[in-house]
Amino acid sequence: MNKIIVGLSGGVDSSTAAAILHHQGYQVEGLTLWLMKGKGQCCSEGMVDAAYICEQLDIPHHIVDTRNLFQANIVDYLVTGYSAGITPLPCSQCNKTVKFGPMLAYGREKLGIDKIATGHYARLDYDSKSDRYLLKRAIDRNKDQSYFLYDLTQYLLAGSVFPLGEMVKSETRRIAAEYGLKTADKPESQDLCLVESSGSMRAFLDKYITPHQGEIVDREGRVLGRHDGVHHYTIGQRKGLGVSAPHPLYVIDLDPAMNKVIVGDRDSATKMESTVKLVNWVSIAPPSTSIRAEVQVRYRSLPVAANIIPLGVNEEKPQDGFRVKLIFEEAVFGITPGQAAVWYEGDILLGGGIIENEK
């Protein structure tokens, strides 16, 4: 009988993934990561629900303490980024360093199981010609989470299974109800797992970064208003600026050194090109010449056609890894340092990386 570990968060998606594999005849074992050092939605109600699901399915349940790993790779990563005036993307970082890697290692080293499954909406194929696993968008484009998986290596993809990739969300809930899962009607979480259910990202960051009031200025340096902490803002933001103007204003830059938020019109918040670092080539080997693909610069943004020019590794900054230049075919709004740029050919995710702060 094939053995597999299912990462259980306590939500309907991971619960249904476990139930599907269990009913397909897999020998399933549930695994829940203990992420937060304090109270949080992901490690209270979620852990209890995950344990209940394992009891319902009559499968073992393992809890792995990854609190220190989560603190170092996610919390500290966020705080460092926001302090520097960028907007980090914790989910892709978490998937690689806290979830998939540690789960696969635990399964192989402790349980003798070399496959893991999650409730992510994504698909995997194997291309024998290139000897590579191809990461693809889910059938349910509205729920597709491949964007957050761009940083997974071939090693991690080879050990991963996504049972929900061919399903739409309504089908997931229907199957959960058919199996009588407790989580069938559980609402989806609307926040990052590290944001306490009664709080917000702003409140979370304020625990680690002391807010300092400063000036909101235009590109010419004219003072238009006051802000309550640079780390509360992100590129492209319009709401919550508290600045009166004859036309809409957007955040176009952040200067934490001078404690200033710079605003401008919408055109000032658009770009025709960007540089991306720490690139992970997923479904293809690193190209030696430019390629054309559809690039997504935020999770919910529409893909834009672009030429992707390989820059290789900067010998002066090897820590930035493989870099590329993106030349867009049309202006793109709100390109934000710290977020991921991910490129696709059709449904196939070719690669992705972190948008550089090009100051």
From Swiss-Prot:
Provide the site residues for: Interaction with tRNA.
120, 339
Q: GO:BP terms for this protein?
A: tRNA wobble position uridine thiolation
Instruction: Name the cystine pairs.
Output: 94-193
Entry's EC annotation: 2.8.1.13
Q: Where is this region: Interaction with tRNA?
A: 143-145, 298-299
Question: Catalyses which reaction?
Answer: S-sulfanyl-L-cysteinyl-[protein] + uridine(34) in tRNA + AH2 + ATP = 2-thiouridine(34) in tRNA + L-cysteinyl-[protein] + A + AMP + diphosphate + H(+)
Q: What class of enzyme is it?
A: transferase
Q: Which residues bind ATP?
A: 7-14, 33, 119
UniProt-recorded Gene Ontology molecular function terms? ATP binding; tRNA binding; tRNA-uridine 2-sulfurtransferase activity
Query: What coarse category fits the chief subcellular location reported for this protein?
Result: cytoplasm
Entry annotated with the keyword ATP-binding? yes
Database matches in SUPFAM superfamilies? Adenine nucleotide alpha hydrolases-like
Compartments where located: Cytoplasm
Q: Which InterPro entries match?
A: MnmA-like, MnmA-like_C, MnmA-like_central, MnmA-like_central_sf, Rossmann-like_a/b/a_fold
Coiled-coil-forming residues are none
Q: Which GO terms describe its cellular component?
A: cytoplasm
- Catalytic site positions: 94 (nucleophile), 193 (cysteine persulfide intermediate)
Q: Which key words are in the record?
A: ATP-binding, Cytoplasm, Disulfide bond, Nucleotide-binding, RNA-binding, Transferase, tRNA processing, tRNA-binding
The keyword Metal-binding belongs to this UniProt entry's keyword annotation: no
Q: What is the protein's known function?
A: Catalyzes the 2-thiolation of uridine at the wobble position (U34) of tRNA, leading to the formation of s(2)U34.
Query: Its family?
Result: Belongs to the MnmA/TRMU family.
Name assigned to this protein: tRNA-specific 2-thiouridylase MnmA
